[in-house]
A protein has these predicted regions:
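Beta-propeller domain segments
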Residues: 22-28, 138, 155-158, 168, ...
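Hydrophobic core register within WD40 beta-propeller blades
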Residues: 47, 93, 141, 190-193, ...
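Conserved beta-propeller blade signature
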Residues: 54-58, 99-102, 148-152, 199-203, ...
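Blade-level signature of beta-propeller repeat domains, shared across WD40, Kelch, NHL, RCC1
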Residues: 340-363
Length: 363
């Protein structure tokens, strides 16, 4: 789960022990290698691949969206350009029909974009207003195969009944921000959303204060009108009926009969954030269509969990380690946030703990 504080405060308060300028000993499966794509960034978060292949990246703390192009195709960013600045904690990014969409904490804006742009040529157009800040401050934007815009917003709290229906949910809008309505509810903090094969997938950060092992972190397949349990229920076994949260104690166990369970689970408090489906051409065939998830890492577990990238089979729900080494003993040497598949088939991973973007490529 995500701590309900701004990142810098969270690192200090949670005792993560994140040392400055660490170079982690990152491990990936045989046949892969890890290299540095970019560094010297200010808590980089989510990425998007532009139509021409440039990598766009959000820096919420600095209020900027950066461009990290690799036009000489050497596997490293050629430069760092500021596409837009003065934004309000920008997080999720998406390209659609000649625009770059940016999910600020208080709403979604878009900038006109043409292939190769590294600086916005016009001002931001605000499309959607969202409840800003409030604990889970990130907002994520994604476009579906239907051309609609999907926006994820987290809760204000650890566990509560929200008064604003935009909280703890995914809403769907027309591309211009009109005709918004709830798409999926009962998701405490769905930081990562991604379409694949006609299905919208989501990561979710479960509640705190139930000990080291409850609830497990869940990965979900969302459907229009679906309810996914929070704050009344949570999944303890993948694909099995959710259980009633007796500690919260609102409503009843019958409520959980209507809650769709997670199709896959991982260790409690590991904080799943961004996800990406591998659709590139350079990994072995067995990785095609696999889901990769960045586990940002726990802040309140006696033995830390997360701090790695996992591979999730969208059919079986099997979860396995793919990229480890961000945690040395109980000391974090980085915190993975988001992933995208680059045009050359490499997997890029942001690390907001050390201000880097890592590149994983098949050898």
């Amino acid at each position: 789960m995500r701590k309900l504080l701004w990142m810098a405060a969270a690192l200090a308060a949670s005792g993560l022990g994140l040392a400055s300028a660490q170079t982690p000993d990152l491990k990936v499966p045989d046949g892969f290698k890890v290299s540095l794509y970019a560094e010297g960034l200010s808590q980089p978060r989510f990425m998007a691949v532009a139509p021409n292949g440039d990598i766009f990246l959000s820096e919420p703390r600095s209020g900027t969206v950066l461009v990290l192009p690799d036009r000489n195709k050497d596997g490293k960013a050629d430069s760092k350009a500021t596409f837009a600045s003065g934004l309000n904690q920008p997080h999720g990014l998406a390209f659609h029909n000649g625009y770059l969409y940016v999910a600020n904490t208080d709403g979604v804006v878009r900038f006109a974009y043409k292939s190769g742009d590294i600086k916005a040529t016009g001002s931001a157009q605000k499309l959607v207003s969202l409840p800003g800040g409030g604990g889970h401050w990130t907002r994520t934007v994604e476009f579906g195969p239907d051309g609609k815009m999907y926006v994820a917003t987290g809760s204000t709290c650890n566990v509560c009944e929200e008064s604003d229906s935009k909280r703890a949910s995914v809403w769907v809008y027309d591309a211009d921000g009109k005709n918004g309505k709830p798409y999926a509810t009962g998701l405490r903090n769905p930081v990562g959303i991604e379409w694949n094969g006609g299905t919208l997938y989501a990561t979710n950060n479960g509640r705190d204060q139930l000990g080291d092992d409850l609830p497990p972190e869940g990965f979900y397949k969302l459907k229009a009108g679906g309810f996914y349990g929070w704050p009344y229920c949570y999944t303890t076994q993948a694909g099995q009926p959710q259980v009633w949260d007796k500690d919260f104690g609102r409503k009843s166990a019958a409520t959980c009969q209507d809650a769709t369970p997670a199709f896959a689970l991982t260790t409690a408090h590991s904080a799943p954030l961004g996800l990406a489906f591998y659709d590139g051409g350079s990994f072995p065939a067995a990785y095609k269509g696999q889901m990769f998830v960045a586990l940002h890492g726990s802040w309140n577990r006696s033995t830390k969990s997360g701090f790695k990238v996992v591979q999730v089979d969208p059919k079986s729900g099997k979860v396995s380690d793919f990229m480890t080494g961000f945690l040395k003993g109980q000391t974090a040497q980085g915190r993975p946030v988001d992933l995208v598949v680059a045009p050359d088939g490499a997997l890029l991973v942001t690390d907001d703990g050390e201000g880097r973007v890592w590149r994983v490529q098949a050898q």
